[in-house]
Each structure stands twice: as C-alpha cells, then as structure tokens.
C-alpha cells in the first residue's frame, strides 16, 4: 500500500470539502522529523491563499472534515498551516503483517502501460567503455522497477550499427578474411581493428576508394556488404553481452533495435514532412525550421533532415524511431536514457515528431539525462595514459580489488566462496556507486569509497542484508515460517515499521522519475533504522515469546525489503560475507 498516496487522497477530499477548488494539491510528504508526525500536508497554505483566508483557520476547517479513521492516531496544525499526521500503531502493525504475508511486500501493481526504454546503445565495432555504464545500469534499474509494477516494458538497445564508417570496416574485414581465410568471431580487440581500418582509410587511397564504394553498396543492399556488416554486428554484440551478463543487466541480443532498423522509413519521413509543409529546401538540403529553437541571431533554428547529397542524419533516424515506437510498438511512454549533451538534439526531433502528428500529446517522451563519470581530478574518467577506460577492464579491476578485500576480511573461506563473494560484491559496488548518485549530476569514481563497508555503498547494503539474515540462522528458524502477530512496544519498532511501509513510495518514485538513487537512499535509511532497532530491541532474548516473534517478523520484512530493493537495482545479495 502507498500510504502517502492514501493520505494525499483523503486530505485532497477534505481540502475540497472545506471550500477549495477541486484538484487543489494536498502536497502530502513524509515528515522530516518524528516530532512532526509520519506525514505532513503542505498544501493548506496554497489553498488558503487562493481563497483569501487565514491558513491556520483553513487548516482547522480541513481537519474538521478530514477522515483518517483507522489510519492516524493524531493530527495537529503546525506553524503557519501545516497539518502533521501521526499514524496509529494498530494501522502500522496491520500493514506490516499484510506486507510480510505478500510476496510483493504490499506493493500494488499499477494499471499496465506499454513502455519503451532506450538504453545502453553502444557502437558497433567499438568496445564498450565507461561512458556506456551510466545509461546501461540506470536504464536497467528503471526497467526492472517498471516491470515489478506490472508494466509491459520493451527494452530498446539503439546500437550505432549504421553510417559511413562501415565502408572502411567492411573493406578491412574483407582484407583480413582474404589474408587468413576466415575472420575469428572473437576479434578480441575491436578498438585495434577500428583504429587499423581508420589508418588504412587515411593513408591508402585505393583502400579509401574501396571503402567509399562499399558505403554505397551497403546502403543499396549489396549481399556481400550486408554479410560483412552483419558479421561486425555479431562480433560486437557477443562481446557486449559478456559485459551485460557480468553486470547482471537484463539486455539480450533480442533487445537490439539499431539505427539500421529505420533505414527504409527515412525517405518516406522526408517526403511526408515536405508534404506537410514542415520541411523546406534550403541550399539543396531538406530543413525543418523550428520557432521553438533560436539560433544566435534569434532566428528559428534549422534542423537538417536530408543533406544535399541525399544522405540522412541522426535526427531523421530519431524521428523515424519515435514514430515506430508509437505506431508499431504501441508505446504509452518512451524513456530515453541518453547523455545530457544530447538534450537539444532530442528535443528538436521530438518537436518535429509532434508537429508532424506522428505521436499524440498523451504519449510521454522523456529524456532521462545523466551526468558524467569523473576521475578524482574532477575530469572525465580516463586511464593513466589519458585513454578511454574499457568497461571490461574496469570490471576486471573491480573484481581484483573485491577479491583482495574479501581475502583480508575472511581468509578462512574456501577459494570458491571467496571468488563468488568477490564477484558479487565487485559488480554491486560498480553499479551502486553510480545508481546511488542523483542521475543528472556528475560523480567522482572512487574505488576506496565504492568498496567501503561504511556509508551508502553496495558492500554496506549487502552486509546489512547478511546481518539481518543471520538473525534467523542464529535462531534456527525460517523467516518464511514465523508465528504470532506484529506488535509495537517500543518507539524503535514503530520507526522501523513506518520506514518499511514506505517501500512502495520509493518504488513508484523510481518508476515515475527514472531516478534509481531514490531506492538507494531508501534502502540506506532503512538499514540505519534497522541497526538502531537491533541495538535497542533484543530479538532472540526478548522478555516475552510474543515480542520475540513480533521482532523476528520485523527482521524478516526488513531482509525481504532490502533483498527486493537491491534486486530492482540489479544487485544480488549474499547469505554470508
């Protein structure tokens, strides 16, 4: 149950009944401090201002008609007109019981929508690097959350699998194949192959001529060029899949929807935009001038959709892509997890899409932009030599560091167990360090911080789960077979239950805002509150058996909530560390 939404609805009804216009926001939020209750309604002052009345007097009118029977034990007016709401212990205990008995921990499924999520999007014939990490793991965490809420999510890995660079790559692939008879499906160093192709293109005019011819042939559907192109895509995606699997990212080959998918749509898009009077010829090119965007002279900005040589641009592809996602995939909502530097480009493409009538206004197009990963020097994260860090190398280093950490903490574990724990901790640390930061901000990549067992880190959260789970090992009981009822005898118990029951609010916020850090913050706060509860409220040596069973239930709900929350982030838990 989303308690915040329930109270918000009740307060909204009361505000309207007290004389405010329908739809006046109640602005119910979680209280910052326990002295202000569990929730606080902040919309009273805005409503009073609209009505031209005293806020505290209006707050009293709202309280007179507010029905929170069976939910709140107390309500009070605070400050200039806030309403503080204190949840009743009976309500909290009953909701905690219901959550523990539910495989979904009380999280309701939403009315299902079809949601397309565009994330990861590496380029063909290039290895994934750290710049792909944020889109890949942020997108995947949001996708998992949306699916948990019952939505149909279509993963779209919009890989860069088309363009003039494929001429030189195919020409080089052909050269290698002629020399060795067959190209290894490994092509272990894609970057080296790409650099070699570029060098040949720049230095060998005959090679460059062949490459240019292959671009034309590929665009014309030449069977040989298509076969070579497909081989390059296959080699790249096999390597990318290894990174996805290591990171526990849910993308597969079936989710690839590359730029090439939309090639056949592009001529028709241009023709249609011309017919609708949106695209006009300008210096031989087809251009859409947008009043919504101005150039430095204050004139409508021109967006080229077809070059004078007949070639199409990324914008043309993005228009076709958005159209396809609505018309063919039936999207109600489309999420783009793309670098913040692409914002204007996307906004221009979407403006054209709306003007052309390809997607109605009730379909949401959302750019979930993200900042950069920085080194300790505050600059983009690079190798010591100043090069781009390959994602596979980053994951290898994470594994080595985690292995050394586990070795130092638990040398008595078997080699197999150490390796398993190190791998789980390493991938979790890399992901959580990113996911725990606000998506739109840059963040500093710091090995020491991300592998620390203190603070808002993956090792801390994984250990928090292990610690809670160990209670049941010590008790010799299964957390799924507990008896008795949850009861509240201490403030720390009430605080823990109140936080546990905010899980659905965190889940829905991540789904709505595309911000996984909300879940990280929630889980970190929950772990801290459980720690306070654990120290203040003895579980296994509780003074009464009924209290022991109640506290075991609270520990079980905490363990399940942490495990489920981390699973939505694509992070595994461990039974022991």
From Swiss-Prot:
Pfam families: Arg_tRNA_synt_N, DALR_1, tRNA-synt_1d. It is an enzyme of class 6 (ligase). Gene3D superfamilies: Arginyl tRNA synthetase N-terminal domain, HUPs, Isoleucyl-tRNA Synthetase, Domain 1. PROSITE patterns: AA_TRNA_LIGASE_I. SUPFAM superfamilies: Anticodon-binding domain of a subclass of class I aminoacyl-tRNA synthetases, Arginyl-tRNA synthetase (ArgRS), N-terminal 'additional' domain, Nucleotidylyl transferase. A motif ('HIGH' region) lies at residues 122-132. InterPro entries: aa-tRNA-synth_I_CS (IPR001412), Arg-tRNA-ligase (IPR001278), Arg-tRNA-synth_N (IPR005148), Arg-tRNA-synth_N_sf (IPR036695), ArgRS_core (IPR035684), DALR_anticod-bd (IPR008909), Rossmann-like_a/b/a_fold (IPR014729), tRNAsynth_Ia_anticodon-bd (IPR009080). It comes from the Bacteria. The keyword Protein biosynthesis applies. It catalyses: tRNA(Arg) + L-arginine + ATP = L-arginyl-tRNA(Arg) + AMP + diphosphate. Keywords: Aminoacyl-tRNA synthetase, ATP-binding, Cytoplasm, Ligase, Nucleotide-binding, Protein biosynthesis. One of its GO terms (cellular component) is cytoplasm. Its EC number is 6.1.1.19. It is found in: Cytoplasm. GO terms for molecular function: arginine-tRNA ligase activity; ATP binding. GO terms for biological process: arginyl-tRNA aminoacylation. Monomer. Belongs to the class-I aminoacyl-tRNA synthetase family. This is Arginine--tRNA ligase.
């Amino acid at each position: 149950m989303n308690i915040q939404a329930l109270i918000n609805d009740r307060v909204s009804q009361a505000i309207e009944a007290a004389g405010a216009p329908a739809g006046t926001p109640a602005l119910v939020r979680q209280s910052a401090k326990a002295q202000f209750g569990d929730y606080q309604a902040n919309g009273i002052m805005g409503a009073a201002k609209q009505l031209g009345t005293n806020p505290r007097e209006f707050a009293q009118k709202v309280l007179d008609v507010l029905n929170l029977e069976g939910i709140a034990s107390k309500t009070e007016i605070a400050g200039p007109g806030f309403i503080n709401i204190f949840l009743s212990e009976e309500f909290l205990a009953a909701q905690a019981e219901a959550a523990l008995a539910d495989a979904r921990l009380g999280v309701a499924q939403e009315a299902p929508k079809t949601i397309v999520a565009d994330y990861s999007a590496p380029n063909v014939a290039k290895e994934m690097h750290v710049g792909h990490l944020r889109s890949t793991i942020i997108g995947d965490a949001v996708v998992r959350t949306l699916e948990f809420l019952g939505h149909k999510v279509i993963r779209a890995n919009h890989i860069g699998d088309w363009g003039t660079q494929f001429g030189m790559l195919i020409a080089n692939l052909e050269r290698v194949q002629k020399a060795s008879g067959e190209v290894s499906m490994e092509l272990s160093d894609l970057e080296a192959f790409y650099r070699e192709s570029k060098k040949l293109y720049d230095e060998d005019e005959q090679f460059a001529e062949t490459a240019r011819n292959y671009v034309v042939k590929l665009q014309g559907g030449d069977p040989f060029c298509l076969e070579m192109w497909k081989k390059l895509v296959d080699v790249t995606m096999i390597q990318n899949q290894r990174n996805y699997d290591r990171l526990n990212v849910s993308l597969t080959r079936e989710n690839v929807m590359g730029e090439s998918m939309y090639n056949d749509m592009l001529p028709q898009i241009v023709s249609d935009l011309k017919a609708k009077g949106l695209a006009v010829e300008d210096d031989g090119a087809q251009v859409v001038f947008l009043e919504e965007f101005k150039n430095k002279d204050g004139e409508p900005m021109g967006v080229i959709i077809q070059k004078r040589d007949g070639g199409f641009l990324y914008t043309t592809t993005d228009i076709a892509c958005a159209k396809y996602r609505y018309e063919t995939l039936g999207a109600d909502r489309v999420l783009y997890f793309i670098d913040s530097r692409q914002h204007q480009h996307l906004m221009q493409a979407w403006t054209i899409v709306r003007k052309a009538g390809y997607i109605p206004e009730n379909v949401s197009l959302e750019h979930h932009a993200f900042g950069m990963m920085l080194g300790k020097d505050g600059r983009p994260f690079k190798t010591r030599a100043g090069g781009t860090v390959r994602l596979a190398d980053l994951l290898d280093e994470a594994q080595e560091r985690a292995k050394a950490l586990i070795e130092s903490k638990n040398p008595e574990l078997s080699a197999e167990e150490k390796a398993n724990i190190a791998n789980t901790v390493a991938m979790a640390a890399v992901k959580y360090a990113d996911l725990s930061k606000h998506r739109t901000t840059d963040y500093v990549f710091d090995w020491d911080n991300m592998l620390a067992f203190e603070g808002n880190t993956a090792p801390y959260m994984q250990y928090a789960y292990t610690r809670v789970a160990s209670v049941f090992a010590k008790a010799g009981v299964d957390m799924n077979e507990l008896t008795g009822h949850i009861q509240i005898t201490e403030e720390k118990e009430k605080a823990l239950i109140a936080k546990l029951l905010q899980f659905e609010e965190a889940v829905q916020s991540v789904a709505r805002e595309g911000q996984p850090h909300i879940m990280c913050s929630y889980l970190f706060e929950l772990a801290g509150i459980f720690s306070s509860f654990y120290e203040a409220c003895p579980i296994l040596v509780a003074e009464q058996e009924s209290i022991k069973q109640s506290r075991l239930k609270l520990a079980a709900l905490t363990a399940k909530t942490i495990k489920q929350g981390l699973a939505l982030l694509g992070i595994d838990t461990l039974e022991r560390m």
